[in-house]
Amino acid sequence: MKYDYLVVGSGLYGAIFAHEAKAHGKSVLVVDKRPNIAGNIYTENIEGINVHKYGAHIFHTNNKKVWNYITRFAEFNRFTNSPVANYKGELYSLPFNMYTFNKMWGVVTPEEAAAKIEEQRREITHEPQNLEEQAISLVGRDIYEKLIKGYTEKQWGRDCKDLPTFIIKRLPVRLTFDNNYFNALYQGIPIGGYTKMIANLLDGIEVRLNTDYLKNKAALDALADKIVYTGPIDAYFDYKLGTLEYRSVRFENELLDKPSFQGNAAVNYTDRETPWTRIIEHKWFEFGKDENGNDLPKTIISREYSSEWKPGDEPYYPVNDAKNGALYAEYKKLADTEPKVIFGGRLGEYKYYDMDQVIAAVLDRCESELH
């Protein structure tokens, strides 16, 4: 059988494109090299807990069209991201807000907090030359030393004095008692996990798992009139112009026979000495309860480590610097010469996308492609 579309990758971009194509009467085949659907938003149910296997994914958006679309495929809970920072046993609220400043300096009013930050910012009197100076010029030395320096150095594997200023363009400072990390109208986690949501999108569509498109390209290409490719763009072209760089993350998962480990979904470890950057406790994304509302007796934590990416590792975050941007632009020119192929998603477009941005991008693409 010849399909109208072959969709490579069953993550958010691929699943939505496949769903929309089918809704427009097109025949679709989805292939994925992993043994499961859902790409990096894959959640696995272990002991009643939906574990975010490729790192925490918290849905947030101000885009009503996107929200109305995705909530057709899942009911979302009211989870609000309120991370905690642990600096050598001292706990601080994130993002930086009045709870943070009260703990740091004992200040009680927004006026006192603003004055303290202003006083500390004055340490940098010249144009910041590196990330350390940039951060101090924005929020002062105390917050930098305790809540930014160690965490950032672990994330990037470099000293803050050797990192460019553009990594921290701005640091949100809230002079209110507000722990809600995302200032978004809509926020939450799909009840029952993301995998269930992707399964709903792919309902009635043929999916072949454990199928590596790039290793079987000619045979798979022959099956369809057009290809939607959501894998790494440089891999598609066999890295012939060079390798695009990513930041990678490594997870150590642990099942614990107790009801709670840290009492919060995310705790960032902001000192340099603790090797992990943060610990995720997955059950709190769904308030510690199973799908029937019962308390879960066990818990699962994931220690997260930043790691230097090398070819073959799982690509997580594109490194959007000038060098990689220029290389992507060259690959994009090659992609434009492939009229049968649509390149989409975080890897296909080498773009740091939040989930709502992926949804908006694929719906736009469907609009132009399928109508």
Indicate where each model-derived feature is located:
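Short, solvent-exposed loop/turn segments at secondary-structure junctions
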Residues: 12-13, 35-36, 99, 153, ...
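Glycine-rich FAD pyrophosphate-binding loop
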Residues: 19-47
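Mid-domain catalytic core of redox enzymes
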Residues: 24, 214-334
